[in-house]
Amino acid sequence: MLVILLLLSLSVGWAAEPLVLDETHKSQIFGETRHYRIFLPGDYATSGKRYPVIYWFHGWSERYNKPVRDDPHRNYDQGEDYDGNTIARFVGSHDVIVVKWDGYNPRTPEENYPRPYNISPVETDRQFPMYFTELVSFIDAHYRTTADREHRATSGLSMGGFMSFWMAGKYPHLISSASNFMGSSEFSVGPRGFDVEYRHEEMHRNYDGVRTRLVTGTRDFIRFYHQRMIGIWKYTRPFFETQEYDADHGTPHMSDTFDFHMRAFAEPLPRPAVWSHIDAYPNFPIWGWEVASDRKQPGLTMLESVSSAGFHSSVREWLPSGRLLPNVKLWIASGGAYPPNKSQLVTVIRLRDGKVRRVSQRADAEGRLRFELDGGEYEVGIGPGPILALGSFEVLGAPWASDGKPVSLRVRVWNKGAAPSTATTLHWETTNSDVDIGTPSRPLPEIPPGGSVETTLLFTVRDPAREIAKFFAVVNNVRLPVEIPMFPTAASAPEFQIADGRAATVFQEGVKRVPLTFGSGNGDGRANAGETIAILLPDGDAYRAAELFTNDWCVDLTRRISDDWSSYDHVGASAKYSLPMIKPGCPVGHVVHMMARIQLPNAPNHRMEYSTIEFPVSAAAASHSGSSKTK
């Protein structure tokens, strides 16, 4: 290969023309030959330099060497499309390598299949995240790369934009910056047979130590979902930037985004001392830790606020508040952060009942500790001293937190260490704009080991459309994060139906009217204890099932359904609705208050509509059969 590169370099003389090579390698992960295109600086053969690498992920119907089918003037590799603002032109004037992998995922040998990456649907056994790490190792072994995370980035368009953010969030220990040109916001991913919905707006905690950039277009068909994502990431994700161009779906001003990566290479973020991670796979590495499980069902494993002092763990069906999966077994190995062959005091708190288990565990020869847990919620503390963590919170005096109004929270603080904490002062902070904190300081009493206390937070969000607010409880220089979902002021719904095993004509896939039965119960149109219901809001001559929110103790909201709108807007995303259960112990006459949200189609600018719902829990009437609508 060196001879070929040298001849190509000599053939272009001293012009800074890049070398664009189409190559193959044998993948052990896939058990097949895979293609890639590599863009090398024009003087690569003679410079002796090492280069940072941007891994590029193409979109639907593209290949490593082919632009999108049936859409002319979309070649961003090289040439004069996009006014010549292409990968090749950028590499020709910068010290960087770009590797464009091949997302080809044929279901049968040699099939001309346009859908890449084996996502939505997961229909083969090719797992591209596992192949990505193999490709990185191959490129580092065969080209003069600067082979560390600080000099490695991802970028991509459309489905490739989704992949860029997914790979950077799955492997932040390998990648220091990620960009996304108008990427799809949501796909099902993971092992075939138990793939799970992966929605970027809910995955913002995966990017500790990573700079991120989202490129949007004023005429892009995905722009509604991008704005939804920005509304979350802007207030929860540091080192996130976004840029909107007057453009339709594509790669406008590519050099602006590649310049973002060059700046990130020059000033990479350090490895985070505290990090969080969410993963769709049962087994995965992250920041030197290793997680394994016996999970054979859709779910997401969550490690939160991980440091040498401990972590929070759980496995859920969906984020942020899907059903926990305590039947799943987890085996977690820490990074080698502890003195080899020395014992550490480990405190484990099972949050559902506060049960505390404390053991002395010996680190192995590599300084790693090992933990066996299940998929329930746990706080794990490591060390002999006090270790504080924030637990659950409750909105006081209201069923949800409202924009523009004072919000009072009761927040639980745990001591997951092995010694009592001393009485001190807790300080509340936020980096969010237009947020006033009414209780910037609160006294925090002594907390016994394994115990908890409650504190309060009073705040007001002055933005009428904020969807989330993030705060930090600062105690003795330790910053403990908490994120609060926010909701706009909304009028009471003038009309709605309670579907408790009864049929109605509802919209599915955005605009299709379909007769469906929702919920399970006696079908009398009232909410009874023990029933599963849906709230249906009228839209013309049919109904839309609502996504619901409340902190009411009588309501179990852990079941959420996704209505795929791909056939309507071609994005791959979905509208959500809830199937809450009225808990069996809920008394007759108890009044339930809920915030209802429906997604109204108007491609590409859909609209979210909010309304409040109120109904009493009724005495059960005579029952008849009803079945629940599922995805």
Model feature map: region roles:
Residues W414-V435, T439, P538-D556, M595-I598:
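Short acidic, flexible loop segments centered on an aromatic residue
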Residues P399-S402, T505, L516-T532, D563-A575:
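Acidic, glycine-anchored loop motifs typical of Ca2+
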Residues D436-P464, W553-C586:
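Intrinsically disordered, low-complexity Pro/Gly/Ser/Thr-rich segments with frequent PxxP/GP/PP motifs
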Residues L388-F393, G404, T460-E495, P580-A621:
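Terminal connector regions
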Residues D364-A389:
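C-terminal beta-strand-rich structural cap/linker in extracellular carbohydrate-active enzymes
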Residues A16-P326:
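Non-catalytic cap/lid and distal C-terminal segments of serine-dependent acyl enzymes
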Residues G404-R410, V453-T455, I468, A529-L536, ...:
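Short, solvent-exposed loop/turn segments enriched in Ser/Thr/Gly
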Residues S321-P340, L426:
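Surface-exposed beta-strand/loop patches in extracellular or lumenal glycoproteins
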